[in-house]
Amino acid sequence: MTNFEPKKFKNIWTIEDSISSYNIDKWGDKYFSINSKGNISVTKDIKSENKIDLFKLVKELKSREINPPLIIRFNDILKDRINALHDSFLKAIKTYKYKNIYQGVFPVKCNQQKNVLEKIIEFGSQWNFGLEVGSKSELLIGLALLENQNSLLICNGYKDKKYIEIATLARKLGKNPIIVIEQRDEVKRIIQAVQELKATPLIGIRAKLSSKSSGRWGKSIGDNSKFGLSIPEIMLTIKELKEANLINEMKLLHFHIGSQISDIAVIKDALQEASQIYVELCKLGAPMQYIDVGGGLGIDFDGTKTSSNTSTNYSLQNYANDVIATIKDSCELNNIKHPTIISESGRAIISHCSVLIFNVLGTSHVSSKLQIFDKKNQQLIISNLLDTFYELKKLKNKKINLSQIIELWNDAKKFKEDCLVAFRLGFLSLAERAYAEELTWACAKEISNNLNNDEINHPDLSEITETLASTYYANLSIFKSIPDSWAINQIFPIVPIHRHLEEPFCKGNFADLTCDSDGKLNNFIDNGKIKSLLNLHKPEEDKDYLIGIFMTGAYQEALGNLHNLFGSTNVVHIDINQDNSYKVRNIIKEDSKSEILQLLDYSSASLVESIRINTESAIDQKKLTIEEARKLMDQIEISLRKSSYLSE
């Protein structure tokens, strides 16, 4: 019997090795690091020394029966992101002597959770931070939550008569809704609402820019973009507003160049075009006050600071500087008063504060043991595989001849294919096929254990790592908790939240609980590169192996679905105290199975009664005892009250 142990790369593994391997110091933005115990630590804000141990926090939450999978939201990080955004604009305003202010709004679509929006409004109150809404439902949220009469409520999206009427009348409540015209037919509805309600709204226009964008959301800009008015349509709209005596309510120009813009050059081009449109609107007689630069402010998911889809080649300060400088230059060249600048920076505000934690349920991997059988009793094609295995074993501890190893690996693959053909034709038994596969894995392991990282990544050998990789079964639904990973291949930082004093010598990916082949995580950040496997530890028996998915605060909860009827996870809001302790502010309990079924119009009582009738019939037919029936019904009723996720 031959045993194959996992390959260890270093004699001593350090915290610095883990930080480098998972690129934590790059994407973590100083909010996340590793403490002396080898656990992920979370910092109150980027200027603070106050930290808590994430692994310890999760263990203590478990003692309260708040179990993974769960979302942990750090209020202090959310506050710090809002502060950082405003501080960057304040610094840019001072540097460029800009003669107006920055006033941000948060796009509700990024995260509609009540506790989140309340905190954003609270933390941004000193700057009159507002909200951006894109539907009537979101409009109602904005009207209910925004109490600061100096805050703005930017009204985007498709607008029917009722939407416009609500926004128009809300102005009489002391609110500041600005109805942004995004479709030509909205002009007629606004004019009609003014005539019927005897009230006037604040009005804005969204422009379709011709500047080219980039990345996944590049089509948000251009002549064929979903929203906005072309230049001829803007001219016609201004004419109609003048004729309706509404030009004095025209206050805002809005544009949007897409989400997660990775290249600052794209932002600069759009700003130059939009600034000139703003200037021309002023010249046409509109008493403009605001320019809303929309969203697009990206974050560095992978820590590479490049223009890839998962990164940005600019900082928060670079962004603010370019916004302020470009708008100032255009206005001053035309003797136009500097406008108040608005941005709808959702992802940059909300992403960092949320961490999704899940536990690993188990693993699957190729067999670590090989039973050696006598060659005399083997068929020729299996004997060939066995010879290849012995040839590879002879190379152990010898000077590496890479071309020889590549040749032997190609032989092993060819012999395995021959075995598969023989099996299909009925010449090999199932046991013989199994032995052939084990021999192939054994060849791969011999090669892996004899080569360094650079050698094993040779194009002719790179598949060996994939062959030997483990699948880690995750107690979560990708479709519910991180749908962007499935839908658009978004890369999120994924890191074990403990055991960083140990070398993660396993290579693996994750499979979720759903019965769907797309329910896998197989794109990871590794030393700043995107790879299909992650460095992981071997789970310890009867101990949790806990993984964190970071920067998940934007869009994921809103977009998540009920695939296989896995519902919402536990959500916990945490404040970090000055003494490095924490306070649990809010707990939003996970969906029970009963609650999930109710969403689909299934009554738990009816389901239970239907099953009870079946058990009575089974008792009558002596297929089930009364005791078995009672136990079955008890388990069903208990299960309906419990989580849709797996428990211990």
From Swiss-Prot:
Pathway it works in: Amine and polyamine biosynthesis; agmatine biosynthesis; agmatine from L-arginine: step 1/1
Where, per the database record, does this protein carry N6-(pyridoxal phosphate)lysine?
A: 109
Q: Which Pfam families match?
A: Arg_decarb_HB, Arg_decarbox_C, Orn_Arg_deC_N
List the keywords (alphabetical). Answer: Decarboxylase, Lyase, Magnesium, Metal-binding, Polyamine biosynthesis, Pyridoxal phosphate, Spermidine biosynthesis
Binding-site residues, substrate: 291-301
Record carries keyword Transmembrane: no
MF terms from GO for this chain are: arginine decarboxylase activity; metal ion binding
Q: Which cofactor does it need?
A: Mg(2+); pyridoxal 5'-phosphate
Name the Enzyme Commission number(s) assigned to this protein.
4.1.1.19
Give a yes or no for keyword Metal-binding in this entry: yes
**Which family is this protein grouped under?**
Belongs to the Orn/Lys/Arg decarboxylase class-II family. SpeA subfamily.
Entry function: Catalyzes the biosynthesis of agmatine from arginine.
NCBIfam families xref list: PRK05354.1, speA
Q: What is this protein identified as?
A: Biosynthetic arginine decarboxylase
Q: What species is given as this protein's source?
A: Prochlorococcus marinus (strain AS9601)
Q: What is the lineage of its organism?
A: Bacteria, Bacillati, Cyanobacteriota, Cyanophyceae, Synechococcales
